[in-house]
Amino acid sequence: AEMQVQYREIVTPEVDATVQALAAQHSVTFSDPVAMLGNARTAALTGGGRISVRGPMREDEAPVVRPYLLTDDIEAAIAAAEAAGAEFAMRATPIPGEGTFAIYFLGGIEHGIWQN
């Protein structure tokens, strides 16, 4: 089995500069802001999935790069993370037309889970 990054989220107060740099470095075009994704601007990743760049959604949301790994069973993935000691910031949350995601903290790192 292999792991696949389905969604890589960059949260930064410098959205325009980050999008401009990534677009120029990789010759890609980012979308207009997508409301369902927190006004993230997205671009396709090689092999499937997307990268997104968005601003903080809360005053206390720190900049972060958070990969969301694809799973066939998000509830089983949540249970496995909990068994390893993870604390969840967001449990399985559907985004209509996009998929279902969860966010957890483990070892001082933010992790994401994604099910299509």
Annotated model-derived regions:
Residues 28-64, 104-106, 110-116:
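Conserved short beta-strand elements that form part of the metal-binding/catalytic scaffold
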Residues 1-20, 24, 65-67:
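N-terminal beta-strand motif that seeds the catalytic metal site of vicinal oxygen chelate
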Residues 24-25, 83:
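Residues at alpha-helix termini
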Residues 63-82:
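Mid-chain, well-packed structural core segment of small domains
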Residues 17, 75-76, 99:
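Short alpha-helical
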Residues 20-21, 79, 106:
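Surface-exposed charge patches
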Residues 1-10, 31-32, 82-116:
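Vicinal oxygen chelate
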